[in-house]
Amino acid sequence: LVATYHAAAVPLAQRPVGQVTAAILRQPGPSLESPLGNLIADAQLHATRLPGQGGAQISFMNPRGVRADLVPDEQGLVRYGQLFAVQPFGNHLVVKTFTGAQLRAALEQQFDSGTNTPERPRVLSVSAGFGYSYDLSRPAGARISHMVLHGQPLTDEARVRVAMSNYLAGGGDNFTVFAQVPDMLGGGQDLDALEAYFRASSPVAPPATNRITRITRSAPATGSNQ
């Protein structure tokens, strides 16, 4: 029976879904965002950006939800089984409305909530168009600064629509602020969103890891948010 199901799954796993220009990895960069995490955030935003899909303006992806690198074959092809290896949990996307202050509080939890600490931070990847800076030398609750959306400052009073997985929306990975907002619009499965993004955008290049800036004494700069 197991062999029968395995044989039936092989054609699905081998189905091409798109192309990449280079391997897209989950290894974090200096700011602790990752190219593959950023790609998934972009795919989630693409799937939820229209008004009927939730009207999302920003998307977040938790690093623990990215389970494998995306390495193409010699022709640059990526297959469905590889996408499944990257996102195997079957989460679905949701969109919630947050104030800028709530987003700031949620981002502070990357460094100060449960097992998320300055020594072992859990930095979310973000979709293109959104960016911010953080400084781990500052005290808890004051580490996030310079939040911007499409080049404009994101104030504490602003209201924005944010896409994420139902796991993250429920407070997963110690992001309890996300669970404090009850309104929610349910969407499709995360894996379907990633496949649709590849079909719409191939060939896909590895996203730059310049959406978030980690401020240090030697490099107190803000991100380019591209």
Map each language-model feature to its residues:
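Glycine-rich phosphate/diphosphate-binding loops and the adjacent beta-loop-alpha structural elements
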Residues: 12-33
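Feature captures C-terminal
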Residues: 38-226
